A protein has these predicted regions:
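Feature marks short, surface-exposed loop/turn motifs that line or immediately flank catalytic pockets
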Residues: 169-170, 239-241, 321, 716
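Bacterial Sec-dependent N-terminal signal peptides
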Residues: 1-26
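Acidic, glycine-rich active-site loops and adjacent beta-strand->loop/helix elements
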Residues: 126-128, 164-170, 210, 239
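Core alpha/beta catalytic barrel or barrel-like domain that forms the active/cofactor pocket
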Residues: 188-210, 232-250, 273, 469
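Divalent-metal coordination cores built from histidine and acidic residues
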Residues: 151, 159-164, 168-206
Length: 912
């Protein structure tokens, strides 16, 4: 062979080998079916192997593991972009970080916006029964790696795509469950035996400002610290009946703290997504008032990104591996602004939903490609706007401030015209002086920063709060010495959070109250429910003590590195005179330390009759000093954040405690409230058993347990016999049969009553406080009115408080409320409120634990008709035979976020 021929042969061989090397295995070659085929789902094990395989076969992809899941699986993220960009990933990541954190000058930002690549996050599978999510992710990944059309190549050149699995554990559970039946037509997603996220189930999409769960933590690190994408896209199911998919833009109200560029960015991307579907003759996209989804709530995977200057997209699409139908909804057939291209009733296949999802992904990626530099610069601009606002006097508008302007104006009219003068015909143009009276009044100004003093009783919980901020990219500073701000002295080791940083909206949202507007279907009509909570201020939920700083300030402050969590060590000081140690009941970590001590066989006592001037609260714990306890205490203080007070004298009034045998109610399929409570108990070292309704019906409970915890949803209403609410469970595997059933008035309640009478204690939370009515205790519903001589519940037009923070007064002299402040913030979601029989209170049969002391208990959120709450009892304890029932109307363990009220559960979990 001649030299020239040899050259061309070798060149051809290289081309062929390159083509072979870049051959991307199709989904069918790997899974044995096409993505979207009827009756077919991929497991996580199969999906993980496929992503590894295609990443190895393509120079467009990099497979990474972002952390472990709660069940120990690898959670992966595949980074997709052009081969040239893959070589410079760290450079582009740094550009994205610099622009996202916005701590650079305008000219540098403009230059980096030209140099950088748009970063787009696309996830799937968060809610594992919403099976389109992870399967569209598989198909999208394949197409991005295998297609060579002009659009795909341009996208790969301009965009870095973070393709992320949001819930590996859930996919493995759900897909195996669906595929277990060999008869395809019998396959079903129904009757899943447990939660598809170990602790939270569907609530895994409510964890993104608290970040309790490992999956949430993994995702947050990539979103808020590592990559800071300009767009994130969160796939869900399902849209409203009569549509195919619901998406951006979303209905009002949107949250007032984030930048308006978020809203207009959602408008632009929503238009791009709708246009793509319409151009491809894919009808059925609805937005705005066409669905219930809004941008008010913080804490969802999508919504938390708004408070970090990212354009967060959600679509909710129909579709199931089992063929389904689009029903006839006549109200959706006429085109309007929300649904310009309605879909007609028809049969619907899984593959159609996959195709729609891929089109939507491409619409987003095409937008990012064509608007790359604008997206990069706008995230910088939003961050810079936040920094600028934090550096100067700023007033944020809110409904209550508008109400204050209107009130002042109306008061002025009354003074001028007289009290009987109607203002109905007055001009809607309010004089500007009333705006100035509010929006130039320093009382209404935004804070420049927040100080979290290190000398607060539960500093460890405050540090947990700060770590939640740090996990989302917020910068926290630590005082290296004592300092004084606005005339108040603060100790060293206090923490400072300034608002002059890019993620200022998130800071304000977690420190300040949410001011939800009064939102009604029409004047005088029923309220429009918020999509999730109306108020959630995390600092309030966690009981964190902090001070607002209203002017520019500085001090001996040291910045913590971005994303590095704070570590708080416990302490103990031993001396020859030490007789024992006290763990303050005001600190949550004290209960964890007590549980460790009890597990080691060390005697622990509770201290009663503590004076108000004491360094610790009534109900705190005492441990006598000896060689064993000294070693244990020192070890616990090193490994945990518990503070041991060394005592030179043994307290005089002590009650010995012991470990209680704890039972926690759950049901077949899993209760999210029970799942979160499991998480809490495990975090604080409480041993427990799960009990199902059949276990309760069997009886003999007192021989096995000392305390039964019944979270919301366990107890049926007194107007219901209970026992309903389950699908046909005849074909479930035998190992789950013992979990079926519901608590009933006929079988279960009598066994619970016997348990109480024999000396057991029961803790009820939320709707499960209905047990008090089943037991005919001397309490009644406070949220009622008398109409025509008949008692009936207050209508929603008169009283409506969706998920919000309210303030209650607490009797912390009771052992059940040890460690609580006299004024406590609670999470309240139209929960039960009680009236006590005065004679029963006098006789000590029932004792109020917490109550609404005034007619304005709202702290954050929305409480229409809150005046009705005044004097209502939020929590009580009642003697039943030898035992006690503890009834907590508010959600004291809410999503493992309400750490300020955890003690109301913990106090009841000992024999004492």
């Amino acid at each position: 062979m001649g030299t020239k021929k040899l050259f061309y042969f070798l060149l051809l061989l290289c081309i062929v080998n390159s083509a072979i090397a870049q051959k991307i295995p199709t989904p069918k070659e790997h899974f044995g079916f096409n993505i979207g085929d009827n009756y077919q789902l991929a497991t996580f094990t199969q999906t993980e192997a496929y992503f590894k395989k295609i990443a190895a076969a393509s120079d467009r992809a990099k497979y990474t593991v972002i952390g472990k899941t709660e069940e120990g699986r690898d959670q992966f993220m595949m980074i997709v972009t052009s081969p040239e960009n893959q070589k410079k990933l760290e450079q582009y990541k740094l550009i994205s970080q610099k622009l996202g954190n916005a701590d650079i000058g305008i000219e540098e930002a403009k230059q980096l916006s030209k140099e950088g690549k748009a970063v787009v996050w696309i996830d799937g599978g968060l809610h594992a029964t919403e099976t389109v999510g992870i399967h569209q992710l598989i198909e999208t990944a394949y197409q991005l790696l295998s297609r060579n059309d002009d659009e795909t190549m341009r996208i790969l050149n301009d965009v870095i795509i973070l393709i992320t699995h949001a819930n590996p554990d859930g996919q493995e559970l759900v897909s195996n469950w669906y595929m277990r039946d060999t008869a395809k037509e019998k396959r079903s997603l129904s009757n899943l035996p447990r939660l598809y996220e170990k602790y939270a189930g569907h609530d895994n999409n409510r964890d993104f400002y608290m970040l309790n769960l490992k999956e949430s933590q993994n995702i947050a690190r990539q979103l808020f610290i590592e990559w800071i994408p300009q767009i994130m896209y969160n796939h869900h199911q399902a849209g409203p009946a009569g549509s195919v998919v619901a998406g951006a833009p979303y209905r009002d109200p949107f949250n007032f703290v984030f930048d308006p560029l978020i809203i207009t960015g959602l408008d632009a991307l929503g238009a791009a997504m709708q246009n793509r579907l319409n151009a491809e003759n894919k009808p059925g996209y609805t937005s705005k008032s066409g669905s219930t989804f809004s941008t008010w709530y913080n804490g969802g995977l999508r919504t938390t990104t708004y408070f970090h200057n990212m354009i967060g997209l959600l679509t909710e699409i129909i579709g199931n591996p089992t063929p389904s139908d689009i029903p006839l909804v006549t109200a959706r057939l006429i085109p309007n602004a929300a649904t310009p291209n309605p879909v007609l009733p028809q049969k619907w296949l899984f593959k159609q939903s996959i195709d729609y999802s891929v089109s939507l992904n491409y619409a987003v990626l095409n937008y990012a490609s064509r608007n790359r530099d604008e997206l990069l610069y706008n995230i910088y601009l939003m961050g810079k706007n936040s920094i600028d606002k934090g550096n100067k006097d700023t007033w944020s508008l809110s409904p209550s401030k508008i109400e204050e302007m209107n009130r002042m104006y109306q008061d002025s009219l009354k003074r001028i015209k007289g009290n009987n003068e109607s203002s109905r015909n007055q001009s809607t143009n309010v004089p500007v002086k009333f705006y100035d009276s509010v929006m130039k009044n320093k009382v209404y100004k935004d804070a420049r920063g927040y100080i979290i003093p290190s000398d607060q009783p539960d500093f460890a919980t405050a540090v947990d709060f700060l770590n939640a901020l740090i996990k989302t990219g917020v910068v926290v500073q630590k005082a290296t010495a004592d300092f004084t701000i606005a005339g108040k002295k603060y100790p060293a080791n206090s923490y400072i959070v300034k608002t002059n940083q890019a993620f200022r909206p998130h800071i304000l949202d977690l420190f300040e109250p949410q001011d939800h507007p009064n939102d009604f279907q029409y004047p005088g009509g029923p309220p429009v429910p918020p999509y999730d909570a109306a108020g959630w201020t995390l600092a309030y939920q966690m009981g964190v003590q902090f001070d607002r700083v209203m002017e520019a300030f500085d001090g001996p402050f040291e910045k913590s590195p971005i994303g590095v969590l704070l570590k708080l060590n416990g302490s103990v000081v031993n001396s020859a005179s030490t007789k024992g140690y006290v763990l303050d009941a005001r600190a949550n970590q004290s209960f964890k330390a007590v549980n460790i001590l009890l597990n080691e066989g060390i005697e622990v006592y509770r201290i009663t009759n503590v004076s108000n001037s004491s360094l610790y609260a009534s109900g705190s714990f005492f441990i006598s000093k000896n060689a064993k306890t000294k070693t244990a205490v020192e070890k616990i203080s090193k490994e945990n954040s518990a503070e041991f007070l060394a005592m030179s004298e043994k307290p005089s009034s002590l009650i010995k405690i012991s470990k209680a045998r704890i039972a926690l109610w759950d049901i077949y399929g899993g209760s999210m409230a029970s799942g979160w409570t499991r998480w809490i108990l495990e975090q604080f070292n409480y041993a427990y058993d799960i009990v199902y309704p059949k276990d309760i019906d069997t009886g003999n409970l007192r021989s096995k347990y000392d305390v039964i915890v019944l979270v919301g949803g366990a107890i049926p209403s007194v107007n219901s016999r209970g026992g309903g609410g389950e699908n046909n469970l005849s074909n479930i595997p035998v190992e789950y049969k013992n979990r079926t059933g519901r608590i009933t008035a006929d079988k279960s309640i009598p066994q619970l009553k016997i348990f109480l009478e024999q000396g057991g204690n029961i803790v009820t939370i939320g709707s499960s406080t209905q047990l008090a009515y089943h037991l005919k205790l001397p309490v009644t519903d406070a949220m009622v009115e008398i109409e025509n001589g008949v008692e009936k519940p207050l209508s929603r037009e008169k009283f409506y408080t969706p998920g919000s923070i309210l303030r209650v007064t607490t009797d912390n002299s009771l052992l059940s409320a040890s460690g609580m402040n006299t004024e406590t913030d609670v999470y309240f979601d139209n929960n039960p409120v009680f009236k006590m029989n005065p004679d029963a209170v006098t006789k000590g049969i029932v004792k109020p634990i917490a109550w609404f002391a005034n007619d304005k208990p709202l702290r954050s959120g929305w409480a229409w008709g809150q005046v009705y709450l005044k004097n209502g009892v939020a929590a009580f304890e009642a003697t039943v035979g030898k035992g006690k029932l503890f009834a907590f109307g508010p959600e004291i363990t809410f999503r493992a976020q309400a750490q300020g009220t955890f003690k109301l559960l913990f106090n009841q979990l000992y024999n004492q």
